[in-house]
Curated annotation (Swiss-Prot):
Keywords: Endoplasmic reticulum, Isomerase, Lipid metabolism, Membrane, Mitochondrion, Multifunctional enzyme, NAD, NADP, Oxidoreductase, Steroid metabolism, Steroidogenesis, Transmembrane, Transmembrane helix
Subcellular location: Endoplasmic reticulum membrane; Mitochondrion membrane
Record's catalysed reaction(s): a 3beta-hydroxy-Delta(5)-steroid + NAD(+) = a 3-oxo-Delta(5)-steroid + NADH + H(+); pregnenolone + NAD(+) = pregn-5-ene-3,20-dione + NADH + H(+); 3beta-hydroxyandrost-5-en-17-one + NAD(+) = androst-5-ene-3,17-dione + NADH + H(+); androst-5-en-3beta,17beta-diol + NAD(+) = 17beta-hydroxy-androst-5-en-3-one + NADH + H(+)
EC number(s) on file: 1.1.1.145, 1.1.1.270, 1.1.1.210, 5.3.3.1
Name of the featured protein: 3 beta-hydroxysteroid dehydrogenase/Delta 5-->4-isomerase type 1
A Pfam family that the UniProt record links to this protein: 3Beta_HSD
Superkingdom of origin organism: Eukaryota
Family: Belongs to the 3-beta-HSD family.
Entry function: A bifunctional enzyme responsible for the oxidation and isomerization of 3beta-hydroxy-Delta(5)-steroid precursors to 3-oxo-Delta(4)-steroids, an essential step in steroid hormone biosynthesis. Specifically catalyzes the conversion of pregnenolone to progesterone, 17alpha-hydroxypregnenolone to 17alpha-hydroxyprogesterone, dehydroepiandrosterone (DHEA) to 4-androstenedione, and androstenediol to testosterone. Additionally, catalyzes the interconversion between 3beta-hydroxy and 3-oxo-5alpha-androstane steroids controlling the bioavalability of the active forms.
An annotated GO BP: steroid biosynthetic process
InterPro entries noted in UniProt: 3Beta_OHSteriod_DH/Estase (IPR002225), Lipid_A_modif_metabolic_enz (IPR050177), NAD(P)-bd_dom_sf (IPR036291)
Record-annotated active site: 159 (proton donor)
Length: 373
């Protein structure tokens, strides 16, 4: 492990940035390569400021460009693959999502074989496990239970197939005669400062007189704070390189949660934003069964219009199910094999996220005031 190097794909993303910040603190790490299709100028600047004893190399390239991936993997010890097209709303074309999430992962695995990279960590998703029905109830689920998404929607399907490919690649022969070892992490819904989904929710609420959308009040989930999700990746990178720990980790997947209280998505949004005057919509909400069938009708309309018009429904059956199901998982296996313990407790995570939300509220209130003038 002395003098190791790490490539992080999707490094400009919400989770990827946190992983980079933590990696540069690793004592034996010589170089971290941050790969993404495009980096925002502020992200690139932040990574440049991280230059300490660990060299930070920023690379822009496409996950579908095999030559780019092969160059990025040269001389690398560990790949952490977070890059993905995340979409449960139907905004991104199906084939684009499958190309990025599945074909991109296959390209990266092949690049690892050709460049003789011995360790590969895949950022999977809780979506690969389901839920498949809003009537399904899973409380403190674990890896020994059989939970697999049956949705054909492109995001859960592509992530599921990519995870299967990653775990199947464990034990593959590398070009230099070595062996590839892989594992996958399945984080719960990730929240925290700079969350793209929370940003959209808060900005919409500010524009709607401080009223938060109510979309998931019937759910019970256990979200994970972004720093804790990132920390699990660091531990996986250490573990796959540790001869004592690696045999237990190879070819395995892990649910990654923390000590955030079990609650609905709506309750989480409210708890994180209530200090800034935001409140949930108290108007009548249709029952889940009705929303589910409305989602089916909207999907049908979208399908029928597809030859002449690209209609994107406001919601679909998959989103209704995701947002209104009891679906929580334990991190005990990660605790046992990776030595995972959450770095940040719930109160600190809540305060950090709430403070960031406050800055977002003030920023967009100012925008509204400017427009009003």
């Amino acid at each position: 492990m002395p003098g190791w190097s790490c490539l992080v794909t999707g490094a400009g993303g919400f989770l990827g940035q946190r992983i980079i910040r933590m990696l540069v603190q690793e004592k034996e790490l010589q170089e971290v390569r941050a790969l993404d299709k495009v980096f925002r100028p502020e992200t690139r600047e932040e990574f440049c400021k991280l230059q300490t004893k660990t060299k930070v190399t920023v690379l822009e390239g496409d996950i579908l460009d095999a030559q780019c991936l092969r160059r990025a993997c040269q001389g690398i010890s560990v790949v952490i693959h977070t890059a993905a097209a995340i979409d449960v709303f139907g905004a991104i074309p199906r084939q684009t999502i499958i190309d990025i999430n599945l074909k991109g992962t296959l390209n990266l695995l092949e690049a690892c074989v050709q460049a003789s990279v011995p360790a590969f960590i895949y950022t999977s998703s809780i979506d690969v496990a389901g839920p498949n029905s809003y009537k399904e109830i899973v409380l403190n689920g674990h890896e020994e239970q059989q939970h697999e998404s049956t949705w054909s929607d492109p995001y859960p399907y592509s992530k599921k197939m990519a995870e299967k490919a990653v775990l199947a690649a464990n034990g593959s022969s590398l070009k230099n005669g070595g062996t590839l070892h892989t594992c996958a992490l399945r984080p719960m819904y990730i929240y925290g400062e700079k969350s793209p989904l929370i940003s959209v929710t808060i900005i919409r609420a500010v524009k709607n007189s401080g009223i938060l959308d109510v979309t998931g009040k019937f759910s019970t989930v256990n979200p994970v704070y972004v720093n804790n999700a990132a920390w699990a990746h660091i531990l996986a990178a250490r573990g796959l390189q540790d001869p004592r720990k690696s045999p237990n980790i190879q070819g395995q997947f892990y649910y990654i949660s923390d000590d955030t209280p079990h609650q609905s998505y709506d309750d989480l949004n409210y708890v994180l934003s209530k200090d800034w005057g935001l409140r949930p919509d108290s108007s009548w909400r249709p029952p889940v069964a009705l929303l589910y069938w409305l989602g089916f009708l909207l999907e049908l309309v979208s399908f029928l219009l597809r030859p002449v018009y690209n209609y994107q429904p406001p919601f679909n059956r998959h989103l209704v199910t995701l947002s209104n199901t009891v679906f929580t998982f334990s991190y005990k296996k990660a605790q046992r094999d990776l030595g995972y313990e959450p770095l940040v407790g719930w109160e600190e995570a809540r305060e950090n996220t709430s403070e960031w939300i406050g800055s977002l509220v003030e920023q967009h209130k100012g925008t509204l005031n400017t427009k009003a003038q």
